């Protein structure tokens, strides 16, 4: 949520920046009108309340003097009725304003490239060499089928499309990956490990920005106002909802492993095979709470920490700076890390690292005290995937496949897989 004071003072400048996102700004235009109406209603109400207080004092004086106060009492009732009417109108206006505030996306940072689609994203850097195969590389689902480690068909029978059973070495590879990722982030980078709930309430989904705008993308629990988490970002960020953090505690860094659940609304026909786009998948999520002046330095650090996973796995990747039209609703700036997928001859997203500035903190009322006894301010929140586990499995199966159908296990994972060197 944007700062309402900033919206009032910098309305035209903010509107210009939001226009680069390609958003419909009809609601945004209504903000100025409604905010002006709100202030007028508050002014009228305050005048009437002041008048009511004066009349109340006059009634008290007349009653003490045993004089007739009926005409003044009647005036007080009329003033009270008018106040109630204005209060009701004010409540309606404030609800409309709140709806608009919750529907306005974050303001892009000045360093975000201006563009409309993913084609306008800007490559920041590349790492690693793409493998040179002496044979036609297979897609990961075919590699997995030969190894008998992933079962999409039976998962489709048990649940439906976009689900999978991991079996044998496939399950062990998945487990090895998220344990390796957590160990790296906790032991080397100093994150605090958290195992979160997989269901959250409406306030939590609103706090991180999934609601109200993207409710159709979420899995809702019938007859309960709970949602399956689309990412551990939601419960972890909301751990500190409605809290004031002492400044010396910052930065706070959390690493969380969880299953994630997404309806993939609007993705019909895309990535219908394999692990790239599933309704349920595992992910290691990194969440940071930082001082505002440190947040962009922390974004670079967060991105490097996610990259380190791919470097240790020796998987080639590139880092992309998302343009204004591909930024996402909540981010002020976002990097996507894309891993090389040989069978598709392209890079695919495996991590997003975002700085939300105070956008989520304002929605979730997360503040910090810069100095002892100082007035609380909103923290800046960041999050990144460190990494999406299923997509990492796909990248390993494709980049490490051999002509005989076996798959070399990355060296860093071997201690997690009983020191096996090859999947066969």
Swiss-Prot record:
Q: Name one GO cellular component term.
A: cytoplasm
Q: In which pathway does it act?
A: Aminoacyl-tRNA biosynthesis; selenocysteinyl-tRNA(Sec) biosynthesis; L-seryl-tRNA(Sec) from L-serine and tRNA(Sec): step 1/1
Gene3D superfamilies, per the entry: Bira Bifunctional Protein, Domain 2, Serine-tRNA synthetase, tRNA binding domain
Subcellular locations according to the entry: Cytoplasm
UniProt cross-references to InterPro entries, sorted A to Z: aa-tRNA-synt_IIb, aa-tRNA-synth_II, aa-tRNA-synth_II/BPL/LPL, Ser-tRNA-ligase_type_1, Ser-tRNA-synth_1_N, SerRS_1_N_sf, SerRS_core, tRNA-bd_arm
UniProt-listed Enzyme Commission number(s): 6.1.1.11
Q: Which PROSITE patterns match?
A: AA_TRNA_LIGASE_II
GO biological process assignments:
selenocysteine biosynthetic process; seryl-tRNA aminoacylation
Annotated family: Belongs to the class-II aminoacyl-tRNA synthetase family. Type-1 seryl-tRNA synthetase subfamily.
Summarize the subunit comment. Homodimer. The tRNA molecule binds across the dimer.
Q: Which HAMAP family match?
A: Ser_tRNA_synth_type1 (MF_00176)
This one is known as: Serine--tRNA ligase
Q: Which gene encodes it?
A: serS
């Amino acid at each position: 949520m944007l700062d309402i004071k900033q919206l009032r003072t910098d309305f035209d400048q903010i509107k210009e920046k939001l226009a680069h996102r390609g958003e419909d700004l009809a609601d945004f235009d209504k903000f100025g009108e409604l905010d002006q109406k709100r202030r007028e209603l508050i002014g009228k109400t305050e005048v009437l309340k002041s008048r009511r207080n004066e009349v109340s004092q006059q009634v008290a004086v007349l009653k003490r003097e045993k004089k007739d106060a009926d005409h003044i009492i009647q005036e007080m009732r009329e003033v009270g009725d008018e106040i109630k009417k204005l209060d009701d109108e004010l409540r309606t206006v404030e609800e409309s304003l709140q709806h608009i505030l919750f529907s306005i996306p974050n303001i892009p940072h000045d360093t975000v490239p201006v563009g409309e689609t993913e084609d306008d994203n800007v490559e920041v850097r590349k790492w690693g060499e793409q493998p040179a195969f002496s044979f036609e590389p297979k897609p990961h689902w075919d590699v997995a089928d030969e190894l008998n480690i992933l079962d999409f068909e039976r998962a489709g029978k048990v649940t439906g499309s976009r689900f999978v059973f991991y079996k044998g070495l496939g399950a062990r590879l998945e487990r090895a990956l998220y344990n390796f990722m957590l160990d790296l982030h906790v032991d080397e980078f100093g994150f605090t490990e958290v195992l979160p709930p997989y269901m959250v309430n409406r306030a939590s989904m609103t706090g991180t920005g999934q609601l109200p705008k993207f409710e159709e993308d979420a899995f809702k629990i019938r007859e309960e106002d709970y949602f399956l988490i689309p990412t551990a970002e939601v419960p972890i960020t909301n751990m500190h909802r409605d809290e004031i953090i002492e400044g010396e505690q910052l930065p706070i860094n959390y690493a969380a492993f969880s299953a994630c659940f997404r309806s993939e609304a609007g993705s019909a026909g895309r990535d219908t095979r394999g692990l790239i786009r599933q309704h349920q998948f595992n992910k290691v999520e990194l969440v940071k709470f930082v001082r505002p002046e440190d947040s962009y330095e922390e974004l670079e650090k967060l991105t490097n920490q996610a990259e380190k996973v791919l470097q240790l796995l020796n998987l080639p990747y590139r880092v992309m700076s998302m343009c204004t039209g591909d930024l996402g609703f909540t981010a002020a700036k976002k990097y996507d890390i894309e891993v090389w997928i040989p069978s598709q001859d392209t890079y695919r997203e495996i991590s997003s690292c975002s700085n939300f500035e105070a956008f989520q903190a304002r929605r979730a009322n997360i503040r910090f005290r810069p100095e002892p006894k100082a007035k609380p301010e909103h923290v800046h929140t960041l999050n990144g995937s460190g990494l999406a586990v299923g997509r990492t499995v796909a990248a390993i199966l494709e980049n490490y496949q051999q002509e005989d159908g076996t798959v070399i296990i990355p060296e860093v994972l071997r201690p997690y897989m009983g020191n096996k060197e090859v999947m066969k």
